[in-house]
C-alpha cells in the first residue's frame, strides 16, 4: 500500500461537535493517516459542520464553498451533513463523502472507501452511537482543558430546536465509563473537565431509570482533576440531591450554566420548555441559598413568535432581579422542521435586534459590578495562552468557562496548563486583570 493521504479537519459549531472532531482525528492518527492543521497541505479536508441556526449554517456553507473553490476533496460531517445530506451531495461535486452525526466513528473506513473512488454517504437515519473511553481521541483544546460528553441526544422537543432530529434521543454513558475517561484525561495533565450533553441534569435517565448526575459528580470527585464544571443544567433537574453534590464535592465548581431561554410563562409555554410556564425564580433563589458562591450563566432568546413588549419587559426585570454573572442573548431563528417555524405573530428582525441590545445593556453593568468585586482578591487562574510579543499570560478563573465567558490577563511567569494564584488588580465588563503572587 502506498502513502496514506494527509487529512485536515475544519471544526465548526459547539463543543459536542468538537468531541466528534477529536475522535475522528484520534481514529485517523491511530490508523496511520498524517493529520495536519494546514488545510492547504491536506489531500482531504473533513468539515465538521453545525446546523443549529441559520447563522451557523451560513458559516458552514462559506467554509465548504471556500474549500470547493480551492479544489479540495471535502468530507462533510456533523449536523449539517445529517440535516441536508442529499442537497449537499447534489450542490457540491467536491464532496466525496457525507458522514452523519451517528457515524463519525466509521471515518477510517469511509476514507478508505473514498480512496477507491467511491462517493460515500454514511448517514444513520436515527443516530444511536455514543463514543466511550475506548474510542481514540486527539484533543484540540488547550493543554489544561478537556470536554467530557456524558450523554448524547435529547428527549425534549423544544419548539425552536432541531437538535433531537439531528442527534437522536438521549443515550447516556455509564458512570464507570465516564470516570475511566476522566482518569485518562487526568493522566494527560488536564486541570479542568467540562461535562457536556444536551441536558446534563438528565444524565442517566435513559440508562438507570432516573437522573444520576449527583452520583456522577460524587464519583468524579475521586478523580485528580482540580476543576470539574457542569454545562447545560436545566433548572428542573437541579434537585436538592444535585445541589448537595455540587456543594459537597470539592473539585466540582459552583458554576451553573442554565439555558433558561425566557422568563415569561406565555413564552416558555410557546417554546415548549420542559418546565412549561413555571417561572424560574424559586429555583434560582434555592440555588443561591444553598450555594452562596454560585456563579450563574444563562442564555435567553428574544423575538420568539408572539413575544410582546410586555413579555420582553418581564424578561428585563427578571435579569435585573437575579443578577446573573454571565448572560448570552440570541435572536430567534425560525428553523424549518421545528414547531416554531410557522408560528403566527413573528417579531420583525429590527425589533429582535433592538431587544437583544437592550437586554445586553441591562446585563453589562451587573457583569461589571460582579467582576469589580474581585479587585484585591487572590484567585486561582488556569493559564492557557501567552502573548509572544508582550509575554502577557491569558487564562481563566473558575468563574469563567472557555469560549463563552471572560478571560484573566496576567503579568508574571507560569507554565501553560497550570493553575496559579493571581491577585486581581483591575476589572471591566467581561475580563479581569492581575499579577501572579
Swiss-Prot record:
UniProt KW keywords: 4Fe-4S, Cytoplasm, Iron, Iron-sulfur, Metal-binding, S-adenosyl-L-methionine, Transferase
Positions of the TRAM domain: 372-437
InterPro entries (UniProt xref): Elp3/MiaA/NifB-like_rSAM (IPR006638), Methylthiotransferase (IPR005839), Methylthiotransferase_CS (IPR020612), Methylthiotransferase_N (IPR013848), Methylthiotransferase_N_sf (IPR038135), NA-bd_OB-fold (IPR012340), Ribosomal_uS12_MeSTrfase_RimO (IPR005840), rSAM (IPR007197)
Location in the cell: Cytoplasm
Domain Radical SAM core: 140-369
Record domain MTTase N-terminal: where: 5-116
Enzyme Commission designation: 2.8.4.4
NCBIfam families hit by this protein: 30S ribosomal protein S12 methylthiotransferase RimO, MiaB/RimO family radical SAM methylthiotransferase
Similarity remark: Belongs to the methylthiotransferase family. RimO subfamily.
Protein name from the UniProt record: Ribosomal protein uS12 methylthiotransferase RimO
Lineage: Bacteria, Bacillati, Cyanobacteriota, Cyanophyceae, Oscillatoriophycideae
Amino acid at each position: 500500500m502506498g502513502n496514506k493521504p494527509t487529512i485536515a479537519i475544519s471544526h465548526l459549531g459547539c463543543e459536542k461537535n468538537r468531541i466528534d472532531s477529536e475522535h475522528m482525528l484520534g481514529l485517523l492518527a491511530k490508523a496511520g493517516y498524517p493529520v495536519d492543521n494546514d488545510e492547504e497541505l491536506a489531500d482531504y479536508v473533513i468539515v465538521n459542520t453545525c446546523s443549529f441556526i441559520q447563522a451557523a449554517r451560513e458559516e458552514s456553507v462559506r467554509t465548504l464553498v471556500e474549500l470547493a473553490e480551492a479544489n479540495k476533496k471535502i468530507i462533510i460531517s456533523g449536523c449539517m451533513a445529517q440535516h441536508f445530506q442529499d442537497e449537499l451531495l447534489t450542490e457540491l461535486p467536491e464532496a466525496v463523502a457525507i458522514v452523519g452525526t451517528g457515524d463519525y466513528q466509521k471515518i477510517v473506513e469511509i476514507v478508505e472507501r473514498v480512496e477507491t473512488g467511491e462517493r460515500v454517504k454514511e448517514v444513520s437515519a436515527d443516530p444511536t452511537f455514543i463514543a466511550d473511553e475506548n474510542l481514540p481521541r486527539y484533543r484540540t483544546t488547550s493543554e489544561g482543558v478537556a470536554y467530557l460528553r456524558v450523554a448524547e441526544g435529547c428527549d425534549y422537543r423544544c419548539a425552536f430546536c432541531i437538535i433531537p432530529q439531528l442527534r437522536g434521543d438521549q443515550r447516556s454513558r455509564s458512570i464507570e465509563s465516564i470516570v475511566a475517561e476522566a482518569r485518562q484525561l487526568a493522566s494527560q495533565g488536564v486541570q479542568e473537565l467540562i461535562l457536556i450533553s444536551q441536558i446534563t441534569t438528565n444524565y442517566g435517565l435513559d440508562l438507570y431509570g432516573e437522573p444520576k448526575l449527583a452520583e456522577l459528580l460524587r464519583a468524579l470527585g475521586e478523580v485528580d482533576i482540580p476543576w470539574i464544571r457542569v454545562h447545560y443544567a436545566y433548572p428542573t433537574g437541579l434537585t436538592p440531591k444535585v445541589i448537595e453534590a455540587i456543594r459537597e464535592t470539592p473539585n466540582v465548581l459552583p458554576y451553573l450554566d442554565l439555558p433558561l431561554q425566557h422568563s415569561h410563562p406565555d413564552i416558555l409555554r410557546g417554546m415548549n420548555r420542559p418546565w412549561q410556564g413555571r417561572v424560574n425564580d424559586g429555583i434560582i433563589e434555592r440555588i443561591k441559598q444553598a450555594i452562596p458562591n454560585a456563579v450563574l450563566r444563562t442564555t435567553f432568546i428574544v423575538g420568539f413568535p408572539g413575544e410582546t413588549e410586555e413579555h420582553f419587559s418581564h424578561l428585563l426585570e427578571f435579569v435585573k432581579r437575579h443578577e446573573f454573572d454571565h448572560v448570552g442573548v440570541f435572536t430567534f431563528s425560525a428553523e424549518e422542521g421545528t414547531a416554531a417555524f410557522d408560528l403566527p405573530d413573528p417579531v420583525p428582525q429590527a425589533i429582535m435586534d433592538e431587544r437583544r441590545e437592550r437586554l445586553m445593556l441591562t446585563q453589562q453593568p451587573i457583569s461589571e459590578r460582579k467582576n469589580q468585586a474581585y479587585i484585591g482578591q487572590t484567585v486561582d487562574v488556569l493559564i492557557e495562552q501567552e502573548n509572544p510579543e508582550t509575554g502577557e499570560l491569558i487564562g481563566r478563573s473558575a468563574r469563567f468557562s472557555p469560549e463563552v465567558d471572560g478571560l484573566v490577563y496576567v503579568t508574571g511567569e507560569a507554565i501553560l496548563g497550570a493553575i496559579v494564584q493571581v491577585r486581581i488588580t483591575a476589572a471591566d465588563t467581561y475580563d479581569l486583570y492581575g499579577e501572579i503572587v
